[in-house]
Regions:
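Long, highly hydrophobic alpha-helical transmembrane signal-anchor segments
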Residues: 1-27, 122-124
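Functional transmembrane core segments of multi-pass inner-membrane proteins
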Residues: 8, 98-99, 104-205, 248-263
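Alpha-helical membrane-inserting segments
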Residues: 19, 23, 85, 89, ...
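Membrane-proximal soluble regions of multi-pass membrane proteins
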Residues: 19-74, 227
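C-terminal ends of transmembrane helices
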Residues: 20-26, 61-69, 109-121, 161-173, ...
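Select subsegments of transmembrane alpha-helices in polytopic membrane proteins
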Residues: 73-80, 124
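Interfacial loop-to-transmembrane junctions
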Residues: 176-178, 211-237
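Conserved post-catalytic alpha-helical subdomain immediately downstream of the catalytic base
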Residues: 193-223
Length: 263
């Protein structure tokens, strides 16, 4: 058990290194396969020992060995987070086929979080492809294809209707098309109950964190908040703690129905 956990954590670090490549290159419409990893300032190809996850960044003290330009701390952070997600996935799902699907989903959320945070875009290469992959996986694994299909419709259509109403009332967008596609992808992988949970939790995070940032920075209400970051966090929580979060959602709905005299 310990050996399997350590292997998965190490694998997560390696995968995290690749995710960093995706995070940097996808917004710039560059190939994620070629050229080999290189310094983005002096373009020198990295040696193998400069590509070891986390340790290379620490060894190089966060700077290129040749031009001494700074290497973003995002690189080891993404690698450590991915390693932790792989480790957590092992304890949550065991060595099962579902583990592979959940880890693929987690990797997509990490990349979307980082890209949306920095560039405020959610690449179709991930969201649209993720919708297809999530639905195909649901044909053989949880949540099942019916729940997945409903999740796609709820994740993509319901927020779109809310955003359209917001646009007509306020005169500017509250959510972008990328957010709808990302939520549809969440629905494809996790099914309709958990896409509801994801939507609710992400909205709460957006109000609390986004509102706090706007208040502290004193920016106008027209400032765009990268909502995809909140979706990613909420979706990962839903994926890894599906049982407790679904139960909490059902209790909240039941409490509301009781309060409203409908149950």
């Amino acid at each position: 058990m310990i050996a399997a956990a350590l292997i998965l954590f190490a694998l997560g670090l390696v995968v995290g290194s690749f995710l960093n490549v995706c995070i940097y290159r996808l917004p710039r419409e560059e190939s994620i396969a070629w050229p080999a990893s290189h310094c983005t300032t002096c373009n020198r190809t990295l040696r193998w020992y400069e590509n070891v996850p986390v340790f290379s960044w620490v060894f190089l003290r966060g700077r290129c060995a040749t031009c001494k330009s700074r290497i973003s701390a995002r690189y080891p952070i993404v690698e450590l987070i991915t390693g932790a997600l792989f480790l957590g996935g092992y304890f949550a799902f065991g060595l099962t086929p579902l583990l592979g699907v959940r880890l693929l989903f987690a990797c997509a959320m990490v990349v979307l979080f980082a890209i949306d945070l920095e560039h405020q875009i959610l690449p179709n290469e991930i969201t649209l492809t993720g919708i297809v992959i999530g639905f195909l996986c649901s044909l053989a694994l949880p949540p099942g294809w019916i729940s997945s299909l409903i999740g796609i419709l709820i994740g993509g259509l319901f927020p779109f209707l809310i955003a359209e109403a917001y646009l007509r009332i306020r005169g500017h967008e509250g959510m972008g098309m990328g957010d709808f596609k990302m939520l549809a992808m969440v629905g494809a992988f996790l099914g309709w109950p958990l896409v509801w949970v994801t939507l609710i939790v992400s909205c709460i995070l957006g109000i609390v964190i986004g509102g706090s940032v706007l208040l502290v920075s004193r920016r106008g209400m027209g400032t765009r908040i990268p909502f995809g970051t909140f979706i990613a966090v909420a979706a990962l929580a839903a994926a890894y703690a599906a049982g407790p979060m679904r139960q909490a959602y059902e209790r909240a709905v039941q409490a509301y129905l009781t309060w409203a005299g409908l149950a």
